[in-house]
Amino acid sequence: TLITEVSPNVVINAAAYTQVVRAERDQELADKVNHLAVANIAKACESIDALLVHISTDYVFDGKALSPYRENDTPKPLSAYGTSKLRGERAISSSGCRYVTIRSSWLFSEHGENFMKRILRNATNQQTLRVVSSETGCPTYAPDLARAIVLCLEKLKDCHSPTGLY
């Protein structure tokens, strides 16, 4: 694999199948990207002793909590997307590789299509915005997540076997 050929010290996996609604129709594709590919990345990282930083999601939970989720809360995904992401997390934790899994939610930036850009676009154009009322989330600015990953790596650089879920 490319990972074993290049042999990096750290691999950051931010790739994911994130189309939540489409994942219900194409569960096999969501599972291939969010679980099986992640399992292969973890296996490659384990073989070269690279640290895997994996970006996951709050969709591994059922969304019924009245307070923010914590790392040790029991996952209970309600969607194919959430299930595929949880399967990826579990593949990593059972792979034997050194890893840090970060659960983010509602990732946004000025690039790409995302919920926050849709809200701003509709507000600017004075268009009605239709959204579900059953979801609560905490938007995460992508550059803030990137800075948090860098800080995490700086804190862990002297720790030989960092493993954790954040």
Question: Where does each model-flagged region fall?
Answer:
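Catalytic helix-loop patch of NAD(P)-dependent Rossmann-fold dehydrogenases
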Residues: 25, 32, 36-40, 60-102, ...
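NAD(P)-dependent short-chain dehydrogenase/reductase
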Residues: 90-151
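A short helix->loop->beta-strand "cap" motif at the edges of active sites that frequently abuts
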Residues: 47-51, 97
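CheY-like receiver
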Residues: 2-6, 44, 91, 148, ...
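NAD(P)H-binding glycine-rich loop region in Rossmannoid oxidoreductase-like domains
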Residues: 1-33
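Hydrophobic residues in well-ordered beta-strands that form the structural core
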Residues: 53-54, 101
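Glycine-rich phosphate-binding loop signature in dinucleotide/nucleotide-binding domains
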Residues: 4-7, 47-48, 159-160
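A recurrent short beta-strand within the Rossmann-like NAD(P)-dependent oxidoreductase core
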Residues: 128-130, 134, 156-166
